[in-house]
Amino acid sequence: MTDRIQRLRQESFNAQPSLSIERALIETEFYKENEGKYPIPILRALNFLEICKRKTIYIGKDELIVGERGPHPKAVSTFPELTCHSVEDLHVLNTRELQRYTISQEDIDTYEREVIPYWKGRTQRERIFNHVPKEWKEAYEAGMFTEFMEQRAPGHTSLDGKVYQYGMLDLKERIAHELRNLDFMNDPEATDKQEELTAMSISCDAAIIFAERHAELAEKMAGRETDPKRKKELKKIAEICRWVPAHAPRTYWEAIQMYWFVHLGTITELNGWDAMNPGHFDQHLTPFYENDLKEGILTRAEAKELMSCFFIKINNQTAPPKVGITAKESGTYNDFTNLNIGGIKRDGSNGVSEVSYIMLETVDDLHLLQPGSALHISVCTPERFLREGCKVIRKGYGYPSVFNPDTYVMELMRQGKTPEDAREGGCSGCIEVGAFGKEAYVLTGYLNVPKILEVTLHNGTDPVSGKKVSLETGDPRTFRTYEELYDAFLKQIHYFVDMKVRVSNYIDRMFAKYAPATFLSLFIDDCIAKGKDYYNCGPRYNTTYIQCTGLGTITDSLSVLKKHVFEERKFNMEQIIHATDTNFEGQEAMRQFILNRTPFFGNDDEYADRIAIQVFNDLYDAIEGKPNTKGECFHLNMLSTTCHVYFGKMMNATPNRRLAGRAISDGTSPSHGADTHGPSAVVKSLGKLDQVKSGGTLLNQRFLPSLLKRDEDLAKLASLIRSYFALGGHHIQFNIVDTATLHAAQKHPEEYRDLLVRVAGYSDYFNDMNADLQYDVIARTAQETF
């Protein structure tokens, strides 16, 4: 790591996230003057242009890649058109102990005076909550599910190689061509297309102006700079910012800066849920890297330094703050920019290059909160690359996670993607996959599957709140067979899935109508060709996911009921319901019996695994094929981020012996402490699921550091990954940390400020996590042997 990178890394690590009201003030002033004067797409594009013209430009000392979303690093914009924070929200964000965002009293007063009055009644969040059905609100408040889009925009996507092939001026030419060819006589949508295409062209202008302002600042700084080396760097930065993004990049440095301007544009236009990522960044940069080496204008060390600068830029972009239930289910500074490394090319060949190794080394050197990193390991991936990745995993940062292109390509093809588009896809966000540069996909929020069983056991009533939240499917005390119970559970699944689909489709329409993403649309096929927005059927593929959570908990709970109530009749249903309602008070003998005598998921046990397969398949059948608003359909995902902790807080105890308020299992991982036969048994259980039916499955594993001490241990880890992927596994990730270290970090947080752990699809600083989430990580089974 160079001295420059050490300084930039430390500055980024030390920076305190803050709230900037600059964007909100510019936007509010613009809307006050212009709302109603233009069609909404053009209004949104002109608003973006105004922000790019007026926002503060920042270039830090030592920086080689330039540009920030806010006026300085880790200054987070607010987006009042989506969620207009109240004064109380701002005070809470400024004073809370965890995930604090500083904001001055002067800014709070200005926000209260200038921003809040205008946006009252105009926000997307109000449009959603003022129009959803009463039964949806009650289920939402009970913790049956969450909704991502209630305060953030759908921007969950990744880019492809177009970013490096076309500059903004090229895109404007393509837009002009489409405008000239509009058929106003025979195409009833021609006027709508004209508005959208015009808005896209304005967005191109905005990006060029934004970069030009960086060039001007760099030149001014160069004029004042006394250090010859830095003066030369600033002049080079100015030159690059005058070329990209107006034109396609010519060099490695320009290519990174090109992407960064595009990235900043998308997260400035709207706060898309899970910031975009550059797709197969190593593959896109490889031609530039190789050509620059050949021309003698770049060394490997310089390429790595530029990559490090890029990583630090991502770390500077703290996630916009969340409030309400969304804050409870996803409380983190991490904005989920996840870098795909390795994998396969569009033609199916090995995609690993020297840039892949540079990225992996940068992950190891910096080990910052962001970006996340994901190794893509196909059957054609070189063993050396996997071994180098395992060396980084061993360090205990919680990343990189590991993905299987051989499975996710089949997932994407099953959804209707071409083989080429599927191979060009990969991970965006946590563990979900999409077709890079060609797909808009919406994550609608999480479904609490164990809670659905809890409601089933109480005949449609939530036992925590006492409110009726669902159908009456019968008193389970009267059920004579396991099949009767499961049929009731299945009816409840369909009820909540259908409720979620109904409201998700309404929310989609609200974004298409009120918040088009005209800048993001520039980079997604086939928005320009169709003349349609990213949110309104413009992309080639338009996918909607429902993320199901708690497979381990629901499997183990059903296993308890099937075996001990209906088959062996050790307990009756009344005893189980009473025990879960009273948190097993006075029933420790029952808990121990359940622990020691129940087949649990994650142990390669056919009894439990058959239940998991049935639940997985029935969730798929309930969700798959439900139509969305864009002519395509809903699909199944199996992940949780941190929502499994929130969901657990909303539940009583469950039949599998889990106590009230404790987290349910995450993604498709086994329940904490249930996987007692080692990681090989875990992956065998998971391998029995037909994961190609999903759009992503999450598997967490925790290893003691002693398990990976020797080089031969790394070979065993690599073999475990290969074995799981041969069984059809989609994803696996590891925490390499012992329990003593985690307890020490709780007692002495000041000594463990940079302790990163894997949460669920992302890594976080252990001491930025609340106590419940810390406990969740500690409680995971610590594997001591393969």
Predicted regions and their residues:
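Conserved catalytic cores of very large enzyme subunits
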Residues: 1-200, 229, 233-236, 240-786
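Extended non-globular scaffold/tether segments
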Residues: 198-209
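Extended, non-transmembrane alpha-helical coiled-coils
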Residues: 209, 213-216, 220, 236-239
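Short, Lys/Glu-rich amphipathic helical modules
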Residues: 218-234
